Amino acid sequence: MNGSKFGKSINGLLVLFLFLVFIIPVVTIFFFDLRFYYIPENEISKFYIYSLIYSTLGILAAIIIARMFRKEERSKIPNTIRLILGILWIVDGILQFQPEMPYGFLSVVIEPSIQAINNVGVEKFLMIGYNIWLLHPFQFDALSGSLQIFIGVAYLLNRSTKALNYISFISIIWALVIWIFGEGLGGIPESGVSLLTGFPGSALIYIILAVPYISPKLGNIKNLQKYFTYTVSAIFLIGGILQIIPGNTFWTKGQLAYDIYMNINQQGENPIVYAILNHTYVYLLFRENYLNIFMFLLMIASGLFILLHIRTGLILATVFVGLTWLLFQDMGIYILPATDPNTGLPLLLMLVILIEIDFQISSKRIIKGAAQGVSVT
């Protein structure tokens, strides 16, 4: 299988995987929201009218941009990145339209993040965004979701270098706003921050994925490989260091099991996910003595192996991130009110991108070597 066919296969499988991962949870979430979360009919009607108008304008803008730049030179960045960003942004936008979001986003998502920060200056800064949102919660929530829909659709419809450059600037700016105000700087100022539970924040991963579209140097496949290799390695190595800091309490018996326990009783939890979490919680509760050192070694080994271009590191990291996304992050979208799939899925997809790039470079080397062999003989 050549690089082109492999890339198309990856893209097809990714779209199918993301569709299956998201469609059932999103339907489940909205079903339970509309059933259990009360909001006055006149207010919910107003909210969805705003959302419909803004989303329609956003989609039209994305279509116009696609038509404007359809004859421009196509981007050399692997198509997988564009598809991943597009789907993730659209899902995030849809989740922002949940009935409880105008007010629940502040009380359930933002307030706990602000309260967990042990820095008065950072706390006051984040309260600025909190108070602005509170002035017009329905309009701001509708605008927020619609902007994310626009970014996602624009990524899916556009393939030209110029268009993706402009879209990525918007994507990076908005992701930065989300990372600061919505994710509390990815939890970095909080005690107990960990790669297991969401460090460094999904929005920061979105920024990392969008950077290649605004950096001409990363149009070269080898430079792109270095960029993702260094970035992914840094995330795992820093995650390993955070895991062994005594102040983060992961050495405390029962802490890791407690992190899973907090996800078990989520309203609207999928029965299959519930069963997996419950069994894991019971298992860890009595066998946690050496688990934290194992987590630390796994993160450090993954980071170093990836940095040294040892493919075992990519396999270790992929399995690790997949399991932690399910067990410790509850797939993000099940932690109500869900606003995104948490850090696990974007990081997992970034590893898939690195695997694809690594395969493309290896294929080119094989083809080049074969061509040189033929010419010599």
Name the predicted role of every residue range.
Residues 2-150, 154-377:
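Extended, low-polarity transmembrane helix blocks
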